[in-house]
Curated annotation (Swiss-Prot):
Belongs to the gas vesicle GvpF/GvpL family. One of its GO terms (biological process) is gas vesicle organization. This is Gas vesicle protein L. It holds the Pfam family GvpL_GvpF. GO terms for cellular component: gas vesicle. Residues 17-36, 58-72 have a biased composition (Basic and acidic residues). The lineage of its organism: Archaea, Methanobacteriati, Methanobacteriota, Stenosarchaea group, Halobacteria. Residues 45-57, 73-85 have a biased composition (Polar residues). Induction: Transcribed from early-log phase, decreases as cells enter stationary phase, probably as a long gvpF-gvpM RNA. Highly expressed in 25% salt, poorly expressed in 15% salt, no gas vesicles are formed at 15% salt. The keyword Transmembrane does not apply.
Length: 322
């Protein structure tokens, strides 16, 4: 894996959940919202791709009868996958299976509400941890939103999987072997300013006129100079963004430009650098190295750096099935 940052993958969800809790603070005594025989959903998975919990591979067998037997043995293993992780609030995580697809869940009795942004962040990070663990066992999952809960126990989840089987299976097949990557593009404006001041004839002319003018006119010329410099910097930022998109587009399936957002402690901007843009891309696992090599070409430019994180489950691109 390339560099991973928990903050970058959960930033949007954390902000959204924190905003929801801020609204709840207006109530003097917020009531805990309970659920009846609830099942908290982390993600949906393809149970036919589960790795054996013993790590052994089944030997290939010829003939339809032997293939059927191998399939039965694999299904038996899927039901006993040993999760080496815990879920939100230290709950035990398990899989509810249904017709080649499944849901990663834990039993719950309440909605996860709190007035503490830090607690929300920890819940969301734990949610992500479970989804990541599922991806190691079952391949690319379909992540569910934080706080997605079904009432009615395992039976209700099994029924939901049955009713939505074709859609879930189709989406899992579509995302199989693909992962989400986050690309943050930074630059040092001071490096560009020093370069452009030596190359831009208009800036040089305005600078010379300032030096020769009186204080009043010099002030106006300074404003013109600053405006010209801002325009050149804005144009350069746009050029870098376009270059980044054109560089990665040939080797990714999907590309989405993301807002600046607030930076978490795990996802901070490098000192003295400004974030130009950030992208989320969906790419085949086999293209990860090629994608990284293409990004290296951009980094070769003066004052430019890139933070490349992943692979993640497709948080940005997965459909809303909750």
């Amino acid at each position: 894996m390339t560099e991973q940052s928990s903050g970058s993958a959960t930033e949007q969800a954390t902000e959204q959940e924190t905003a929801k809790q801020e609204t709840g603070r207006k109530n003097e005594q917020p009531e805990e919202r309970t659920v009846t025989d609830g099942r908290y959903l982390y993600c949906l998975i393809n149970t036919t791709t589960a790795e054996s919990e013993t790590g052994s591979e089944q030997e290939s067998k010829a003939g339809s009868e032997q293939e059927s037997k191998a399939g039965s043995e694999q299904e038996s293993e899927q039901a006993t996958v040993d999760w080496s992780t815990t879920g939100v609030d230290d709950n035990t995580v398990y899989v509810i299976e249904g017709e080649s697809v499944g849901a990663v869940v834990h039993d719950c009795e309440r909605i996860y509400d709190t007035e503490s942004p830090e607690q929300v962040k920890q819940w969301v990070l734990r949610h992500q941890h479970v989804v990541d663990a599922a991806s190691d066992v079952f391949g690319t999952p379909l992540p569910m939103r934080f706080n997605t809960i079904l009432e009615g126990g395992d039976t209700s989840v099994t029924q939901w999987l049955h009713e939505n089987h074709d859609t879930v299976r189709e989406e899992l097949t579509s995302f199989a072997g693909t992962w989400e990557y986050r690309i943050h593009l930074f630059w040092e404006p001071s490096t560009f300013e020093a370069q452009i001041e030596d190359e831009d004839d208009q800036l040089q002319e305005l600078q010379q006129r300032q030096e020769e003018a009186g204080s009043g006119k010099s002030f106006l010329l300074k404003k013109q100079y600053d405006k010209r410099l801002r325009e050149r910097k804005q144009n350069r930022r746009a050029e870098l963004t376009t270059t980044l998109q054109e560089t990665v587009r040939p080797v990714v399936r999907e590309l989405l430009k993301q807002g600046s957002g607030s930076q978490l402690a795990e996802d901070t901007t490098p000192t003295k650098k400004e974030q130009v843009t950030r992208l989320a891309v969906l790419a085949d696992e086999e293209n990860e190295t090629v994608l990284g090599d293409r990004l290296d070409e951009i980094v070769e430019q003066d004052g430019v750096s890139i933070k490349f994180t992943g692979p993640w489950p497709p948080y940005t691109f997965a459909p809303d099935l909750g």
